[in-house]
Amino acid sequence: MAVKVGINGFGRIGRIVLRNAIIHGDIDVVAINDPFIDLEYMVYMFKYDSTHGVFKGSVEIKDGKLVIEGKPIVVYGERDPANIQWGAAGADYVVESTGVFTTQEKAELHLKGGAKKVVISAPSADAPMFVCGVNLDKYDPKYTVVSNASCTTNCLAPLGKVIHDNYTIVEGLMTTVHATTATQKTVDGPSNKDWRGGRGAGANIIPSSTGAAKAVGKVIPSLNGKLTGMAFRVPTPDVSVVDLVVRIEKGASYEEIKETIKKASQTPELKGILNYTDDQVVSTDFTGDSASSTFDAQGGISLNGNFVKLVSWYDNEWGYSARVCDLVSYIAAQDAKA
């Protein structure tokens, strides 16, 4: 039976989670809340997407609801999560994709309106974090709020796990060359907390902070304190790439490491999550790719048997949203068994 889901926040991730839910098949989005978009604009924003193209199915308004492919979706415009009537719409699970309510306490406000569980589509300071293919076995049905971590952590963690399981990571540094996101400025503008982040997104390569590498230590405890990293924001609309440099305990040639990753990508745990390519790829080749991470065999290099650079691509919108759907589906299945 399909999982009944509500989406709070109909921005980039909210809309692409909905597109993925339609493809996913066992997720039924029954409600959307966004106080900043009216229903007509919601239809337009969902149908037309500069990055992922025009939605090919039917999108219309009927009886005050958003109707996609004939399925009605209740639309709310509440600013306070506690006031959203998820229960009345039949939504058991809420995808919290505003980027605002990312703590356990704030996300739990959704429960007041009748939701049973909340999945935050962002890293959280205190909610348990899960990465598909890495630590789903640690999920406990008693959790009411969970985080799907970040798009970059979803790219890095499966790759890091394979390397750590086979060669033991001593320490490492990650750089993500990251596509522009909605929080950036089209031209120079005020950004008090991050001065460089306020510079025009289309005109600059912008160094930025990211907690993605440190967060790997939360989903793989044996890597805690062994990884950190930074980001460069670049003027592309979508698709990012992780550059991971690690020192490994068990020496291996780059060819051996490639073969290990290739084999791991074909296992049931990582199939479709960690992909492998030998092709001469560039970023746009991954637009709309649903994998969390695609290892670029031609992109990496090793200095010696213990020091290696690994490169892995990810569609930071589409791939991440696919994992949000997978996580919702997984926890619903576990909850049903509890």
Curated annotation (Swiss-Prot):
Q: Which residues form the active site?
A: C151 (nucleophile)
A single cellular component GO annotation: cytosol
Primary location:
cytoplasm
What UniProt keywords are attached to this protein's entry? Answer: Cytoplasm, Glycolysis, NAD, Oxidoreductase
Which GO biological process entries does UniProt record here?
A: glucose metabolic process; glycolytic process
Cross-referenced InterPro entries, in alphabetical order? GlycerAld/Erythrose_P_DH, GlycerAld_3-P_DH_AS, GlycerAld_3-P_DH_cat, GlycerAld_3-P_DH_NAD(P)-bd, Glyceraldehyde-3-P_DH_1, NAD(P)-bd_dom_sf
One of the record's GO molecular function terms: glyceraldehyde-3-phosphate dehydrogenase (NAD+) (phosphorylating) activity
Top-rank taxon of the source lineage equals: Eukaryota
Instruction: Note the site residues: Activates thiol group during catalysis.
Output: H178
Q: In which pathway does it act?
A: Carbohydrate degradation; glycolysis; pyruvate from D-glyceraldehyde 3-phosphate: step 1/5
Q: Which residues bind NAD(+)?
A: R12, I13, D34, R79, N316
- Compartment list: Cytoplasm
Please list the residues that bind D-glyceraldehyde 3-phosphate: S150, C151, T152, T181, T210, G211, R233
Which top EC class is named for this enzyme in its record?
oxidoreductase
Q: Which reaction does it catalyse?
A: D-glyceraldehyde 3-phosphate + phosphate + NAD(+) = (2R)-3-phospho-glyceroyl phosphate + NADH + H(+)
EC number from the UniProt entry: 1.2.1.12
Question: Which SMART domains does the entry link to?
Answer: Gp_dh_N
Self-association state and partner proteins as the record states: Homotetramer.
PANTHER family attached to this UniProt entry? GLYCERALDEHYDE 3-PHOSPHATE DEHYDROGENASE, GLYCERALDEHYDE-3-PHOSPHATE DEHYDROGENASE-RELATED
The record's section on NCBIfam families has: GAPDH-I
Family of the protein in this entry = Belongs to the glyceraldehyde-3-phosphate dehydrogenase family.
**Protein's name in the database:** Glyceraldehyde-3-phosphate dehydrogenase
